[in-house]
Every structure is written in C-alpha cells, then in structure tokens.
Amino acid sequence: FQNSDLANLNVRKAISLAINRKDLCENVLKDGSQAAKGFVPSGLSISPEGKDFRDEAATYTSYDKKAAQAALDEGLKELGKSEITLRLTYGTDESPMDVFATYLQNAFSSLKGLKIEMVATTKQDRIYNKQKNGDFDLVVTRWGPDCGDPTTYLTLALTDNNNNYGHWSNAEYDSIMGKVNSETDANARWQLMIDAEKILCEDLGYIPVF
C-alpha cells in the first residue's frame, strides 16, 4: 500500500466493518444491487459440482460499527496517531458511484479518529490519472467481468496486474494463482481459487461493497 495508514490491517478492517452494505443496497441504491459477500460476486461462476462460487466460499463482509471503532482504535494505537485523514476519490459523472461515495463518507466519518477528504473528479481522470499514478487513498471503482470464471476478478489482485492500482501484494496469493493457471483438475482448481480469495479478503487487499 502506498498510504502508510492503509498499510495497517486494523485500519482496513475498520473501513470494511463501517459499511452497512445491506442498507446501502436496499435503502439508498435501490437498483437491484446486492451486498457483496466477497471479492467474486454471486451469479458469476458455477463449480464443477454445479454450485455458485459464492455459496461455496465464505462470507467476508459484515457491518459492525462497534467492532469498526475498536479496530480503528487499535490501528491508531499501532500507528502512534490519534487521528488519520484519508482521501476518498470518486467520479461525479458516474452514477450511482457519486451517491455511493457520499454514503461512504458518512459511514467513515462516524468513526472517531477518521477524517475523510472527498476528491471529486471525472471517471476519465479517476482511471487514467488518479488511479494510474497512485494519486489516491481510497477510490470508488467497479469491475465488469470479462468471462464467467472467478479469475476475471481474482487476477486483479496479482502483484504484477496493471489494474492493481492499490499495489496490494501477497506472495502466497500470487503463488496460489499461479497454480490456478496450471491446474488441470477442475475441482482442485476451484478449491485453489477459493483459497486465493480467502487470502485476499482476510487481508482486505480490496474492500468489496456491492
């Protein structure tokens, strides 16, 4: 992570726990969006046994404001700080991402010790300048799958992937994903992808929302 505050796992945990994904989807977006349970979305991939990836993998998201504050307190203690400020970058021409960003601002600002600075820009500037140059702390982004395989999402977190703008890097994750590419047994490959997502989600390399 380029931001030393976000390099702290407890700070990342606080951010994820502060988001009420169910409330966001049902009462704010109201467009059929579903709360994310992990990095690979529901309805994308079916296992060799005919089961949805999301049903076989664990759920890695939850909303718990008290736990979020506790995680932030611990993170601040580890960092030796009483307060941190994070920039939240979003495109004003990207609906509903602008509404989503405001929701996040309110959620994060409710935590004592965390200040949010909103960085409003355009989609083009967000992708080709801010993200490409690493000029962000938190950024509201999305991904459209290229195919119905979990790797269309999982490869985004590889150390050398050009779309890994946050520069999260985990050697074990990279190793498992390398095995995914070469594994010929469909069931074994499926389990490797579940294992890889577990590493990514537990370390909060990305924070899936909806």
Where are these regions (language model features)?
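Ligand/substrate-recognition segments at binding pockets and active sites
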Residues: D73-P145
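Short, solvent-exposed loop/turn and secondary-structure capping segments
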Residues: E26-K30, G38-F39, F100-A101, P150-Y153
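Extracytoplasmic/peripheral linker and loop segments enriched in polar/acidic and small residues
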Residues: N10-K13, C25-E26, T59-T61, K115-I127, ...
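Extracellular/periplasmic catalytic domains that process cell-envelope and extracellular macromolecules
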Residues: N8, L79-K81, Q131-G134, G148, ...
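Structural transition elements
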Residues: A35-G75, E94-D98
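Sec/Tat-exported extracytoplasmic proteins
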Residues: A18-D23, V28-G32, L44, L72-L79, ...
